[in-house]
């Protein structure tokens, strides 16, 4: 780090945060059954549409042996995000379940290439 982060610098940067909503997806009771993969495919299609519309800023599928299936960060408040998730095909089919967590972050932050 080239310079020390002062309290003034912190206050300036922190004043730029905005409201976002973090969604944590976990495997539901129907995960891995029947046509779950096709339902997940449609879930992904929907996520890509939400990304294109600017509502879903970050999408991270989790690929390990845990019950966690993924996370997403929505550029929407918790109520709007709940409405979006309640209409997700994987949620409706019981393939995935979700938790919503209101959060704040810095606009224009991104993942490195």
Kindly give the residue locations of the regions a language model identified.
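Conserved, structured core segments of small domains
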Residues: 1-113
